[in-house]
Swiss-Prot record:
Region of interest: Disordered: 32-53, 218-242
Name of this protein: Large ribosomal subunit protein uL2c
Assigned GO CC terms: chloroplast; mitochondrial large ribosomal subunit
Family to which this protein belongs: Belongs to the universal ribosomal protein uL2 family.
Protein encoded by which gene: rpl2
Keywords: Chloroplast, Plastid, Ribonucleoprotein, Ribosomal protein
Membrane-spanning parts: none
Any matching Pfam family: Ribosomal_L2
Gene Ontology annotations of biological process type: mitochondrial translation
Entry annotated with the keyword Signal: no
Main location: plastid
Length: 275
């Protein structure tokens, strides 16, 4: 992937960059793996906003991604590398020898024509999936399961990877992208390699309208609201918030407050907290 910088023909193109999509091999999606996806846009069943700053955006068709990689022992061939509007990573269309087609996340370095396989003793090659217990120390993996059989949930974003640090007993020690070090079952499956599209986070949005295309609504500061709308609101001109610490619109502590439950069952698997 490369990044293309636009010339400042208008204020909206000044300091704006886009992907050059050089890795994309086709613009036609696989219709059998696409479906309508009704997005909630931050509202519940009554239409009440439950998550602010969401709404609008371009319509999208959801691509069904194979996060489980459960085609055990059946080789597949990469047919295309495609753009997915629902994520910042690219997806690869794989044709298996039994005729089935599936989408997977495209690891960095996977090209059209490459062969991949999911097996207990699969070779340590980019795109292959196998249990963590059979992956050597120091390997980089993505699309890792929290629980065996749950499907990949960790390291699915563009450029994400997990480092395998140690193996002991029934667990494997891994380092997450957040620098958190935790234990995961050795029977959980993972895919070899790093998720592609490494430069996705280097793109400059350039203008507010581009975020609206993505379904992101404006974020208004509490200090410019009225006092009946936010605890930070009110006052004459640019007034301080009048509290010892920032709070949310509902009065809960914000900006630095830990949100993880202190007695959560999975805390025993975390060896070092994220930074």
């Amino acid at each position: 992937m490369g990044i293309r910088f636009l010339k400042a023909f208008t204020p909206g193109t000044r300091n704006r960059s886009v992907s050059d999509f050089s890795e994309i091999t086709t613009t036609k999606r696989e219709k059998s793996l696409s479906k309508m996806n009704h997005r909630s846009k931050g509202r519940n069943n009554r239409g009440v906003i439950t998550c602010r700053h969401k709404g609008g955006g371009h319509k999208r068709l959801y691509r069904e991604i194979d996060f489980r990689r459960d085609k055990i022992g059946i080789p597949g061939k990469v047919m295309t590398i495609e753009y997915d509007p629902n994520r910042n990573a690219r997806i690869a269309l794989v044709m298996y020898e039994d005729g089935e087609k599936r989408y997977i996340l495209q690891p960095n370095g996977l090209r059209v024509g490459d062969s991949i396989i999911s097996d207990l003793q699969a070779p340590i090659l980019v795109g292959n999936a196998l249990p963590l217990r059979n992956i050597p120390l120091g390997a980089q993996v993505h699309n890792v399961e929290f629980q065996p059989g749950s499907g990949g949930q960790l390291a699915r974003s563009a450029g994400a990877l997990l480092d395998i640090l140690a193996k002991e007993g029934n667990f494997v020690t891994v380092r997450l992208p957040s620098k958190e070090i935790r234990l995961i079952s050795k029977n959980s499956w993972a895919t070899i390699g790093q998720v592609g599209n490494l430069e996705a986070y280097s793109i400059r949005i350039g203008k507010a309208g581009r975020n609206r295309w993505l379904g992101k609504r404006p974020t208004v500061r509490g200090s410019v609201m009225n006092p009946n709308d936010h605890p930070h609101g009110g006052g004459e001109g640019r007034a301080p918030i009048g509290r010892c610490r920032p709070v949310t619109p509902w009065g809960r502590p914000a900006l630095g407050q830990f949100t993880r439950q202190p007695k959560k069952y999975s805390s025993k698997f975390i060896l070092r907290k994220r930074k």
